[in-house]
């Protein structure tokens, strides 16, 4: 399997006009549309990226790339983010997509959904065997989101348990260290009360 790495010695600025020209020459080429939309996204031209991603979705056949494009589209079109993220998961069920949805619920403060979807993400152990596999999805994020949402739902023991799991995966993360101290103090306080202390 070949993996392409960007040439960091060259400016990204040259890619956009080249991709635009490629799309002008072959407007139905899904691969060109995908890379053009992605480059527009990197240049923070979210409206243009949204339109090109929507065009790309009409022609693509590759589920991995389509799922990834839908996650980009969710960022370009935040009012419809949940719809795009659910479609991404339906297109290709993977930890990256499920965690993106959990993170959306974290951003929108939908704590029950965030907790449920974070737990679902934890169950996905198999990594994608292509360039769509992303390291961050297999780190502490699912456990951190579960801990935060459990805290918001006043599920103190769950907050501590998942907070400790996040910390175990990233033991030097200051936020995780502080969160676990915070969660533990709440759990200890409740246990003291229940013991009549």
Language-model features, listed with the residues they occupy:
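Structural register within alpha-helical repeat arrays
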Residues: 36, 72-73, 101, 146, ...
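Residue at a conserved register position within TPR or TPR-like alpha-solenoid repeats
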Residues: 40, 70-73, 77, 105, ...
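Short coil turns that delineate tetratricopeptide repeat
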Residues: 27, 61, 92-93, 126, ...
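Residues that mark the junctions of alpha-helical repeat units in TPR/alpha-solenoid scaffolds
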Residues: 29, 33, 66, 94, ...
């Amino acid at each position: 399997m070949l993996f392409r790495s960007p040439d960091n010695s060259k400016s990204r600025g040259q890619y956009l006009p080249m991709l635009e020209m490629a799309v002008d020459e072959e407007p139905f080429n899904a691969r060109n549309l995908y890379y053009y939309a992605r480059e527009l996204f990197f240049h923070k031209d979210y409206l243009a990226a949204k339109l090109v991603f929507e065009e790309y979705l009409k022609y693509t056949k590759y589920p991995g790339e389509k799922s990834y494009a839908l996650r980009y589209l969710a960022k370009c079109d935040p009012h419809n983010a949940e719809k795009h993220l659910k479609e991404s998961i339906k297109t290709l069920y993977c930890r990256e997509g499920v965690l993106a949805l959990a993170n959306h619920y974290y951003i929108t403060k939908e704590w029950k959904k965030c907790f449920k979807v974070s737990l679902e993400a934890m169950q996905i152990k198999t990594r994608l065997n292509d360039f769509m596999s992303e390291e961050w999805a297999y780190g502490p994020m699912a456990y951190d989101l579960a801990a935060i949402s459990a805290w918001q739902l006043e599920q103190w023991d769950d907050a501590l348990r998942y907070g400790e799991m996040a910390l175990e995966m990233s033991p030097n993360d200051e936020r995780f260290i502080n969160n676990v101290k915070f969660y533990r103090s709440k759990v200890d306080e409740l246990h003291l009360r229940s013991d009549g202390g």
